[in-house]
A protein has these predicted regions:
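Sec/Tat signal peptide C-region and signal peptidase I cleavage site
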Residues: 17-21
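Bacterial N-terminal signal peptides
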Residues: 8-16
């Protein structure tokens, strides 16, 4: 058997997401994929422990939520046994019952349901789309979000939700790009301005809504792109928002790369030739140092390290980029994650804002190469 065939088989074992990642060309990830698969499974086992405690709302300024949607998305992408175990249904039911009230919640729920079964959960995804469209700020960003009037969704009639395969549970064909999409009309807006963290997740969620068959207003993409272009710093990077006097840092810049590419894709513009994207590539290549994510408002200390690792994955996957400068992001990140997984299957940063459940979810999303690349059509 050829080396390419063996590599393709190994990637297939991680699931459809990993296999899609290596389309052109089939790049050697440079890590032991059997060890990666085992680490993913151990991480999934960890986040399924003690769910009664994990799913309780926590008091965090601006959030007021729990981690159910992030756990759900990580389990969907982990695939295999992760989506057939009873804990998966517990997390799914919990996430579906909660009223949409926050940007992160709506965005990640849309991502999870679109990856799991967009036909069965179309009504829920449509509500996520409406919530996100109605919460876009005047300047094109998103803030934490607030409740909007939404109908009570239900499962699609005549369809059954059954577990899918690894790396995304793709149990129905994605024909959203070849059939008429259901338009989402903007009915309101958020505050005057938001931040680049909520904004990058809102755009990821809206991308999933589009892929599930819902047409996001053209102006939503236009304003979203304008917000990123107008807040890019001279060094090519981004920080959290205009209010904080701090320099660019990796996680916001990686989020910016993916966000600009998403917006330009739906605006039918060539993101590959974008000066905004290429300047950001330069910043990441110059400052690539996994897992360090020095944040100015935290005194330059590395913070939100696993949030940062998942942002690397999205920047690389969305733009079909295997390296930033000389840095092969998947090899470097996967090796670091394999070295730093704890005995109980979890990951947790020792730096500020470490959290075992969140950090483990972000690690799983990185290792599974969870993000579907944007297919550039030459427009």
């Amino acid at each position: 058997m050829t080396r390419s065939f063996l590599l393709a088989a190994a990637l297939a074992a991680l699931g459809p997401s990993a296999l899609r990642a290596a389309d052109e060309p089939l790049a050697d990830p440079g890590v032991d994929l059997a060890r990666v698969r085992a680490a993913i499974d151990r991480g999934a086992e960890f986040i399924c422990k003690d769910l009664d405690k994990t799913l309780k709302p926590y008091a965090e300024p601006g959030h007021g939520q729990c981690d159910d949607t992030l756990i759900l998305y990580a389990l969907v992408k982990a695939g295999g046994r992760s989506v057939s175990r009873p804990e998966f249904k517990q997390v799914l039911d919990h996430a579906l019952k909660r009223k949409l009230s926050r940007t992160y919640q709506a965005a990640v729920l849309a991502m999870a349901l679109e990856a799991y079964n967009p036909a069965v959960y179309a009504g829920y995804i449509q509500n996520c789309a409406q919530f996100l469209v109605d919460n876009q700020c005047d300047n094109g960003q998103w803030s934490y979000g607030s409740e909007v009037d939404l109908p009570t969704p239900s499962l699609a009639a005549g369809l059954t939700a059954t577990p899918g395969g690894g790396g995304g549970g793709e149990i129905v064909s994605r024909d959203a790009n070849t059939r008429a999409k259901t338009p989402i009309q903007r009915r309101g807006s958020g505050p005057p301005e938001g931040d680049n963290s909520n904004t990058q997740y809102a755009l990821l969620g809206l991308r999933s809504c589009e892929d599930a068959g819902f047409k996001v207003p053209f102006d939503t993409w236009r304003k979203g792109l304008s917000a990123w272009v107008s807040t890019q710093r001279e060094d090519g990077g981004w920080n959290y928002d205009r209010k904080h006097d701090e320099g660019s840092y990796p996680s916001m810049t990686e989020g910016g790369i993916g966000s600009v590419a998403i917006c330009m894709h739906f605006l039918q513009r060539n993101w590959k030739a974008s000066d905004t994207v290429n300047k950001a590539y330069g910043f990441i290549a110059k400052n690539f140092d996994v897992p360090k994510n020095p944040v100015g408002r935290h005194g330059g200390k590395s913070s939100f390290e696993y949030y940062h690792i998942y942002a690397i994955e999205r920047a690389g996957m969305l733009t079909n980029r295997e390296a930033f400068g000389p840095h092969r992001w998947y090899k470097i990140g996967a090796e670091w994650l394999l070295q730093n997984q704890k005995g109980d299957g979890s990951w947790e940063s020792k730096m500020p804002f470490g959290h075992p459940v969140k950090d483990t979810c972000f690690a799983i999303l990185f290792l599974t190469r969870a993000t579907r690349p944007i297919v550039y059509s030459g427009h």
